[in-house]
Structure formats: C-alpha cells, structure tokens
UniProtKB/Swiss-Prot annotation:
Signal peptide: none annotated. ATP binds at V60, G61, K62, T63, A64, Y207, R219. Belongs to the CDC6/cdc18 family. Keywords: ATP-binding, DNA replication, Nucleotide-binding, Plasmid. Involved in regulation of DNA replication. InterPro entries: AAA_22, Cdc6_C, Cdc6_lid, ORC1/CDC6, Orc1/Cdc6_arc, P-loop_NTPase, WH-like_DNA-bd_sf, WH_DNA-bd_sf. This is ORC1-type DNA replication protein 11. One of its GO terms (biological process) is DNA replication. It comes from Haloarcula marismortui (strain ATCC 43049 / DSM 3752 / JCM 8966 / VKM B-1809). Pfam families: AAA_22, Cdc6_C, Cdc6_lid. GO terms for molecular function: ATP binding; ATP hydrolysis activity. The lineage of its organism: Archaea, Methanobacteriati, Methanobacteriota, Stenosarchaea group, Halobacteria.
Length: 414
C-alpha cells in the first residue's frame, strides 16, 4: 500500500467548492445580473460599450458575475460577423499606479518576444504604446480592472474611457469595467473620472442566508457524494456566512474545510458539529493572517476596537475610537497617526472582515459618518495581538479575556 491513496468516500468533485469554479448558472444574484447584462447589451448592438463600475464587499459575486456574463457575451458576440470583441481581465492587486496598469495592458496585447519593462519609460511613451496596441487590435475592447481600488492615482481611469474622444484611438471602441471592494473608492475619484468611469453603477449587496443556501446547495450537489451531508449542514454554513458579512467565499471555504475534516477523521458523513469545528479553525487562521499583515498602528486600532466592544461602546464613530487609539499609541511609545490615516486603517480592517462599517446620514445637521463594530471573536483577536498587548498593557475591559497575572502566551495555550 502506498503512502498516498485516493479518498473517495466524501468528495465527488472537491474543486466545485473552490472560488474559481464556474457553475453553469449563477444563483442568488438575479437582480444584479439582469442590470449587468443590460449594461453590456450595447456590445451586441454594435454600439460604443458602456463603462461599468461594480462595488460591494468581497465574496458577493462581483468577479464571478463578471466572468459568467463575459463568457456569455463572448460566445454570443461570435455569432455576429460585424462584432469583433476582445476582453482583457487584469487584477490590480499589487499594481498601485496608472503607469503599472498601462505597462501591463501593453504586454497583454503583445506576444512574449515584444514585452516591455515595467520601469524606465516616460508615461507619455507608455500611453502611446497602449493606444497603438488597442488600435491594432481594433473592434470592441472591454478592459476589466478587478480590485481597481488598489490604484492610487486615477490617471488611467480617465485616459482609457476618454481615449477615443481625445483622438488617441480611431479603430478601437473601449469599455472599462471597474470592480471594487471598497465603497469609499468611488467617492475618492476626481469628478472627471467619475463622469467617465461610472456611466453604469451596480452595487452587489451582501448575500442573505437564503441566497447562501442556494449557492451552497448548488455546489454541494456537485462536490459531495449523495448522503454525505447530514440535515442542517448547508443551513448552518449559510447562517455563519450571513453573519460573516454575507460572504459566499467564506461560506464555501467553511463547507470545504468541514469536508476536509470529515475526510481526515475518516467519517462517512458531515455533521453540524464538524461545521462548528471547521469554523473555529478557519476563524483563528483568518484572524491570525489578517492581523499579521497589519502595521503597528493597525494593531493599535484593532486593540482599541476590542476594548470598546467589551465596554459595550460599539458601534463606535471615529471620534469615539480615536481617544482610545491615541492613548494606546502613547503607551506603546509611538506618535499617533492623524485622523485621516487612522480612518484608513479602519477601512482596511473593514475590508479584512475584522470589523464592519455602516454609513449613517443624519442630513444637514448631523452629516454623514460611519460607525464601526467588531465582527470577529475578541478572544481570538487578542490571541493574535500578543506583542501589542504586551506593549500597551492589558486594558481593564479585557481582563475577563486575559488573566492579568498570566502572559498572553499562556492565554493562547489554554
């Protein structure tokens, strides 16, 4: 018998639970996909394509919906002899400047022997190369910029939609699809970029439990053998997903981790108890990974949120969080950040799912502001903040979670 043998009792097709799996039909996003399809319709009509901006939290179907509709758009466009459609999808994670985006796009249209370096060219030269490549391609070109909020300067977001109007292109018709996880990204765009990029805006809200059940059931039917899932497993995974900001990706990860635990334990079925065990494993890992990637100031902001949560003072506005954060920074021996930079850390924590942000509008008198709440287990967060708690000290609000006489390492081992 070999060291590795195939397991066939639990999974029929484990890959059906992965993020990149493309089902034949997308469920739970009918309203958004209908609006999205209508926004793409001008391509089939032979018209100038719309510029489309999608926004919503991670795991709510923006990228999956885009891939699904683009696949159908390319398939249907091929039926018409007068439509020449090209689609380029680019993930902007790790690309912080318009220059980097432009060079990547140039290389997307060139073969491997004609690639250009990502440094060393004047910006105007790179843009000229890009216009040449786009016009050489011709026809209708859709450029999909996923995680577009990573771009720190918005020059490319103005130049691309306006390229034809500015006489930089004569043959190609360009459309931009921008996908953002950051709700505030649109607000930070310059007015001229907003008017060009945001012709059609579609918000993808969080999934509710009913929609998550549809998604999980669709994937589970492909992923698992009949009879493996006990009653209530799908519903419990969906309930956790709805609680975790309506993130389908996290719900699928939870179902996969549960299946993996069942396989590791050599059980024949998947139970609700295994779901709870898998959730604990995933949440600890997610918190550790998210917090380890933060700066020292990010750690202090998280710690401030935990203490406010334990005092029953959340949801909290920035003005309520700042004094606690400032106090912790001083105790840690570092200068506190200005309010705007502290808000940036709150936004990052919200994107990571460690906290949630709700926008409030009280009209002219109260204005618009955001309230923040803790979304993950405070005990697990403290376990990941060992050095920060050591530097600042154990706040009185969390003494019930951390024994003041014990080290945090002792706490983690209990």
């Amino acid at each position: 018998m070999g060291m590795f043998e195939r397991d066939t009792e639990i999974y029929l097709d484990r890959d059906a639970l992965r993020e990149d799996y493309q089902p034949e039909n997308l469920v739970g996003r009918d309203t958004e996909l209908n609006r999205y399809r209508a926004a793409l319709q001008p391509v089939i009509n032979g018209e100038q394509p719309n510029n489309i901006f999608l926004y919503g939290k991670t795991g709510v179907g923006k990228t999956a919906g885009t891939r699904y509709l683009i696949d159908h758009l390319e398939e249907d466009a091929a039926k018409y002899e007068d439509i020449d459609l090209t689609v380029k999808m680019l993930n902007c994670d790790g690309l912080s400047s318009s220059y980097q985006i432009a060079t990547r796009l140039v290389n997307e249209f060139r073969d491997e022997t004609s690639q250009i370096s990502t440094t060393g060219y004047p910006r105007a030269t790179v843009y000229d190369m890009l216009w040449t490549e786009l016009d050489s391609c011709g026809g209708t070109i859709y450029i999909v910029l996923d995680e577009v909020d990573h771009i720190e300067d918005d020059s490319i977001l103005y130049q691309l939609p306006r390229a034809r109007a500015n006489d930089n292109l004569s043959s190609a018709k360009i459309g931009i699809i921008g996908i953002s996880n950051d709700f505030s990204f649109r607000d930070d765009l310059s007015p001229k970029v907003k008017s060009s990029l945001c012709e059609e805006e579609i918000q993808f809200p969080a999934y509710d439990a009913k929609e998550l059940i549809q998604i999980l059931q669709q994937r589970a039917d492909v992923a698992f053998h009949d009879g493996v899932l006990e009653d209530g497993v799908i519903e419990l995974c969906a309930a956790y997903g709805a609680k975790d900001a309506g993130d389908a990706r996290q719900s699928l990860d939870l179902l996969m981790k549960t299946g993996d635990l069942a396989r590791d334990k050599d059980t024949d079925t998947i139970s609700e108890d295994l779901v709870r065990e898998a959730r604990d494993v995933l949440e600890r890992g997610r918190i550790q990974e998210g917090i380890s990637g933060l700066t020292q100031h990010g750690h202090l902001v998280v710690y401030a949120m935990v203490t406010l949560d334990q005092e029953g003072k959340t949801p909290a506005r920035t003005r309520d969080i700042r004094p606690r954060y400032t106090n912790f920074a001083e105790k840690a021996g570092i200068d506190p950040l200005v309010p705007r930079r502290m808000r940036d850390h709150l936004g990052e924590l919200s994107m990571l799912g460690i906290i949630s942000a709700i926008e409030r509008n009280e009209g002219r008198r109260g204005g618009t502001y955001r309230e923040y709440s803790l979304e993950m287990d405070p005990e697990m967060i403290l376990a990941a903040l060992e050095k920060t708690v050591d530097d600042v000290g154990i706040h009185k609000s969390v003494t019930n979670l951390v024994d003041a006489e014990a080290t945090l390492s002792d706490f983690q081992s209990t």
